Amino acid sequence: MNIKQLVRKNIQELQPYQSARTIGGKGDIWLNANECPTFNRLKLENIFLNRYPECQPRELLLRYSSYIGLDKKNILITRGSDEAIELLIKTFCEPQCDRIVFCPPTYDMYNVSANIMGVECLQIPLLNHSWQLDLKVIKKCINNFKLIYLCNPNNPTGSLINFRDVLALLKMTYGKSLVIIDEAYIEFSPMNSLVNLISQYSNLVVLRTLSKAFSLAGLRCGFVLANFSVIKFLLKVINPYPISTPTSSIAIQFLSNINISKMQDRVFSLILNRCWLINELKLISNCIDHIFYSASNYVLVRFRNSNKVFHELSNQGIIVRDQSKKINLKNCIRISIGTSQECLKVIHAIRKIDCLYVN
């Protein structure tokens, strides 16, 4: 039997998302997935798994509500922000009819999730090197899409969207489409969060996660923050038991005041490491073409020969993320910010590579 003939045509042609773990690599310094390199201790006690969990665990909603400064009715808990990305398309887009917009170079799951759902994607690239929205092109297409996904800070560029541009976008799309801001990395630039605009704009949706600054990438816990008119429809579509009891218990622990304080200390430490790494990279001139500004826990670097650098780093046990196939990112590599020791090893390794250009 030919199983392929039973598969939806768009799935047959689908290019799946290539996660850091899927790509893999040989080494002991993993700087390819923007994970937090350190972790808090946790306790799992008196957890009973014979009962189904709450669809939206009340205590977790209250904890996150307190952390974010938003009413719990404006919060939906999901299995990481990846589920939220897909859930919004599933809820608001008609397959083979509606469109979404995303602005590359950016996170690939916006495109992949739409393709899985049979929803057309319209790519409007960020303005080259400034990495800002091309509002003129977006305005021309304003009646042709239901959702627009923006990542802020953007992955993989590390850039921030101009606040005035976001306001202009919210106004021009009002009553026509939803503006979805993915704030997976916002704890590294908290002053740039758009959560405070949710009460003013019913077409604004903000996505959050515990995977990055909270160092819980393995937990899979994220949040949709939006007007209740959006949340109530997402509740119709989300699976009945999306958040396991252990997931909820751990997330609640990490949202305690003491663990939020530890998270903020960890973020401060990573920002110091990022500044040090960037300053050291600026002293390496032969193999590096450009170092991009970053407001996140990674830095994007354009090398003169990214393929050579990528493989040399891999040979030295350092796994980074090749971005050179993405639009406007020729010869670019994204380096996650690790511990101070890991950053030091990265610099030593790139200095060795730099010497090859001299000799």
Curated annotation (Swiss-Prot):
Associated pathway: Amino-acid biosynthesis; L-histidine biosynthesis; L-histidine from 5-phospho-alpha-D-ribose 1-diphosphate: step 7/9
Record PTM N6-(pyridoxal phosphate)lysine, positions in chain: K212
Cofactor(s) it depends on: pyridoxal 5'-phosphate
Any GO BP: L-histidine biosynthetic process
Keyword terms: Amino-acid biosynthesis, Aminotransferase, Histidine biosynthesis, Pyridoxal phosphate, Transferase
Positions in coiled-coil regions: none
Enzyme Commission number(s): 2.6.1.9
InterPro entries tied to this protein: Aminotrans_II_pyridoxalP_BS, Aminotransferase_I/II_large, HisP_aminotrans, PyrdxlP-dep_Trfase, PyrdxlP-dep_Trfase_major, PyrdxlP-dep_Trfase_small
Top EC class, one word: transferase
Single Gene Ontology MF annotation: histidinol-phosphate transaminase activity
Catalyzed reactions: L-histidinol phosphate + 2-oxoglutarate = 3-(imidazol-4-yl)-2-oxopropyl phosphate + L-glutamate
Assigned protein family: Belongs to the class-II pyridoxal-phosphate-dependent aminotransferase family. Histidinol-phosphate aminotransferase subfamily.
HAMAP family: HisC_aminotrans_2 (MF_01023)
Subunit structure: Homodimer.
PANTHER family noted in UniProt: HISTIDINOL-PHOSPHATE AMINOTRANSFERASE (PTHR42885:SF2), HISTIDINOL-PHOSPHATE AMINOTRANSFERASE-RELATED (PTHR42885)
Protein name, entry field: Histidinol-phosphate aminotransferase
Gene source species: Buchnera aphidicola subsp. Schlechtendalia chinensis
Taxonomic placement: Bacteria, Pseudomonadati, Pseudomonadota, Gammaproteobacteria, Enterobacterales
